[in-house]
Amino acid sequence: MALLAAATLNPTTHLSLRSRAGRNSENLWLRSAASSQKSKGRFCNLTVRAGTPSKPAEPIGPVFTKLKPWQIPKRDWFDKDFLFGASTSAYQIEGAWNEDGKGPSTWDHFCHKYPERISDGTNGDVAADSYHLYEEDVKALKDMGMKVYRFSISWSRILPNGTGEVNQAGIDYYNKLINSLISHDIVPYVTIWHWDTPQALEDKYGGFLDPQIVDDYKQFAKLCFESFGDRVKNWFTFNEPHTYCCFSYGEGIHAPGRCSPGMDCAVPEGDSLREPYTAGHHILLAHAEAVEMFRTHYNMHGDSKIGMAFDVMGYEPYQDSFLDDQARERSIDYNLGWFLEPVVRGDYPFSMRSLIGDRLPVFTKEEQEKLASSCDIMGLNYYTSRFSKHVDISPDVTPKLNTDDAYASSETTGSDGNDIGPITGTYWIYMYPKGLTDLLLIMKEKYGNPPIFITENGIADVDGDETMPDPLDDWKRLDYLQRHISAVKDAIDQGADVRGHFTWGLIDNFEWGSGYSSRFGLVYIDKNDGFKRKLKKSAKWFSKFNAVPKHLLGTTKPTGQAPV
């Protein structure tokens, strides 16, 4: 997706995550809960990647500066098994919104009924037309030397009503895509759900606000495993549940567009302080059910993997103070921890339980057991970082959004007046590669060093950016990606178990609330020339980067059991 963080610039709004590794301050509440929230330690016998040590990049100033030649990452910095690829999602690229038996999704409904909620009034009816042009997408991946394509399944394309009758034409489409990828030596990584719930289920019982969604999602996942599992070995159950819950049920700026009465959203009939947690709870329960089913019945290869893809944001304390250190810890808990802690340890972070109270649903013991250690792999979608600033916890402060519950504001500028990094063409993305390195080390040190894929990472070309007049000369994206690939290598050198980097996105597509005015693709879509795919400068760089023969690359080095 590319996280459209429309609210990250609001100082009282807190969207996403992370922080500096290596700082010893702990969350005040977590100290008292540490003994009861130890990981069950599923992640063991992991590997640390070997390769030529990378050259550290110079500090980034307030503007984009190109790396020195010796700082540009090389493929042989990474071992032969490290995977480079690109990601997309169904609604953003496929088009064909009502063709061949497909049913409407919540995003079809949202864009058609509330076009004013999209900045340019557009929709995904045609998008990049990948339903018809998927072979061109595969060709672009092959031309770049990419080894992985991460894409999502449209629930309403294969189950038009969300349940019941299967649409064989939808199954056939994904079979053709998967077979084409494999024939070109590209590995499919499948996201089962990427925000586009069938509208039929939204109309029937409110979608993810109702517990019925858990079983319906399980049946959808079962159909995916049965239809594609003979060729697909790597699965993500959900993509970016944190952003989905905050934007769809808190602020209401994404489908289905719900928020509290009196707020400015498409459907001001919800509860912005409760519904995000209700929807998130059902997502976690659906994940647990799907994973248990997969491990019991559908691990057809014996070594197939399943996990979840989390949206993440790096965090630094606003200033060097105890209170801002604690704010940073709460920021981590309320964003990364909200969905990560349950799938690792079986419950929400203690700080969330302390501050949210009865608005946060409770797991049964059986649910906790199913959730704990329910990810074989984890995806992290990283774009940017923020400073975290303490907000006084007081009975006089009444949260209006669930994102206020952390009592930590998200700032782009620190106490010294400097931005956290140079702003990109996209107003919410400030380039801060260190945030990615730090986040990966947090995963290593706090969460048992799970196998991680960077499942999204990139920036957008935007309308009106005079520094990039040529749509194919995306020099900012190239610099951004080079620095973040180097940041991944820095984390690997310090022991983080990172297995791959997937750029967001493969092609220019429909970017949710920004429509087509914000374009994240490595590949340009020329809509005036039959939606022809044209490689941008960054894509051509990947073609050279990935051209190193595999036999010249190193191999992994096994380590002992990961820390827990």
UniProtKB/Swiss-Prot annotation:
Disulphide bridges: 259-265
Major place of residence: plastid
Presequence range in chain numbering: 1-50
Tissue spec. comment: Expressed in young seedlings early after germination.
Localisation per UniProt entry: Plastid, Chloroplast
InterPro entries the record matches: Glyco_hydro_1 (IPR001360), Glyco_hydro_1_AS (IPR018120), Glyco_hydro_1_N_CS (IPR033132), Glycoside_hydrolase_SF (IPR017853)
Keyword list, A-Z: Chloroplast, Disulfide bond, Glycosidase, Hydrolase, Plastid, Transit peptide
EC number: 3.2.1.182, 3.2.1.21
Keyword Chloroplast carried by entry: yes
Record: active site: 240, 456
Catalysed conversion reaction: Hydrolysis of terminal, non-reducing beta-D-glucosyl residues with release of beta-D-glucose; DIMBOA beta-D-glucoside + H2O = DIMBOA + D-glucose; DIBOA beta-D-glucoside + H2O = DIBOA + D-glucose
EC class: hydrolase
Any one cellular-component term (Gene Ontology): chloroplast
pH dependence, record text: Optimum pH is 5.5.
UniProt GO molecular function: beta-glucosidase activity; DIMBOA glucoside beta-D-glucosidase activity
UniProt cross-references to PROSITE patterns, sorted A to Z: GLYCOSYL_HYDROL_F1_1, GLYCOSYL_HYDROL_F1_2
List of residues binding a beta-D-glucoside: 92, 194, 239-240, 383, 456, 504, 511-512, 520
Entry similarity comment: Belongs to the glycosyl hydrolase 1 family.
Purpose of the protein: Acts in defense of young plant parts against pests via the production of hydroxamic acids from hydroxamic acid glucosides. Enzymatic activity is highly correlated with plant growth. The preferred substrate is DIMBOA-beta-D-glucoside.
PANTHER family, per database record: 4-HYDROXY-7-METHOXY-3-OXO-3,4-DIHYDRO-2H-1,4-BENZOXAZIN-2-YL GLUCOSIDE BETA-D-GLUCOSIDASE 1, CHLOROPLASTIC (PTHR10353:SF326), GLYCOSYL HYDROLASE (PTHR10353)
Name used for this protein in its record: 4-hydroxy-7-methoxy-3-oxo-3,4-dihydro-2H-1,4-benzoxazin-2-yl glucoside beta-D-glucosidase 1d, chloroplastic
Organism: Triticum aestivum (Wheat)
Gene (UniProt): GLU1D
